[in-house]
Amino acid sequence: MTTQETIELFKKYVIANYGRLPRVMVKGEGCYMWDADGNKILDMFPGWAVSGIGHCHPKVVEAIRKQAGELIHVDNTFYSEPQGRLAQMLSERGFGGKCFFCNSGAEANEGALKLARLYTSKQKKYKFITCEGSFHGRTFATVTATAQPKYHEGFLPLLPGFIYVPFNDVKAMEAAFTDEVAA
């Protein structure tokens, strides 16, 4: 399939929730990706795990192969030894405490918002401060937390309780903090 045919396939069958670059990526290795036309590209895109771990590291590929041969997915209704061992490793090498596993940045941010509300609910704190130009995800709460009007279009009214302040404006940040702010 050509690059243009793949792009047309997406136009016909995939919701356009991202502005995509006109490249079809077919391979990755380390910090590089290759497109369908054979161009080698240094992958410097932020926000996704591959930016931190690279593409197709042999140890990661082997670990995935091994696990896929045993069990691909287990619902959180059940226990999983690898998940338990990962939680232990993260806790012991990080800040201690317990882990919250999730599948995306939006889910992580949504979880953080809920945790902040839960932790501060007895003090009647329910507001959140986010910075203008931020991006927090595509769930309802994280779209609301995203202080960019272009992401709000079509989803109004947004959830209440979000305050937007300019980046690097300490006075605006201080002014936004009230007794109702959870995070």
Label every PLM stretch briefly.
Residues 1-29:
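Active-site-adjacent loop/helix segments that line or gate small-molecule/cofactor pockets in enzymes
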Residues 2, 56, 60, 82, ...:
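Short acidic-hydrophobic sequence patches enriched in Asp/Glu that either
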Residues 5, 9, 63-66, 85, ...:
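A non-catalytic, amphipathic alpha-helix used as a structural packing/dimerization or gating element
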Residues 12, 40-125, 129:
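Glycine-rich loop-to-alpha-helix module at the N-terminal edge of alpha/beta enzyme cores
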Residues 23-44:
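Active-site and channel-lining beta-strand-loop segments
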Residues 25, 56, 82, 165-168:
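Short secondary-structure boundary/capping elements
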Residues 30-32, 49, 54-56, 107, ...:
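Gly/Ser/Thr-rich beta-alpha loop segments that engage phosphate groups in nucleotides
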Residues 87-183:
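PLP-dependent aspartate aminotransferase-fold enzymes
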